[in-house]
């Protein structure tokens, strides 16, 4: 039986290509990595959004029943600490005025104060994510809120945090559009360099 050189080449080529592929399995902590990447993107958009909204608009709300932009900023700060506090052993150190001042008062703080506190809470969350891995996602943690406590998995806290940030980014993006400001996610993306 005669084997043609073409047949040998067709059979050998895929084997040689597979051998050249870098070995390795899935990335370490793929679930945590996905949540971290999504959350960091939302943080970036939220920071850009609040940076681009003029201070005069921080009292804006579309209807009397809705939250002001300033209220949303301070609320995000509180939520970031609430969720990210449960990602591991690291806990935030907050000044008494940050924990004892009523939300309605914090909502009227100057823009630079609110944005600085928001960015500090983002940094805390980034550091909290660094101590988290997939093996810890099933751990039970105690969530205490408004005087009530309940058990929840760390995965629930990570998912809750991502959903909360997406919800508030959507809210701020709508407020921005109502004020003729383009939200960060709608801005043209820079051109990628061609190779």
Give names to the regions the model predicted.
Residues 1-2:
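N-terminal secretory signal peptides that target proteins for export/translocation
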Residues 5-16:
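Bacterial N-terminal signal peptides
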Residues 20-28:
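Cleaved targeting-peptide boundary
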Residues 36-47, 59-100, 142-195:
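Short, contiguous alpha-helical
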Residues 45, 49-50, 84, 124, ...:
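Well-ordered alpha-helical scaffold segments within catalytic/enzyme domains
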Residues 52-60, 128-138, 177-184:
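Surface-exposed helix-capping loop/turn segments at secondary-structure junctions
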Residues 105-143, 151-167:
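Acidic/histidine-rich alpha-helical segments that form the ligand environment
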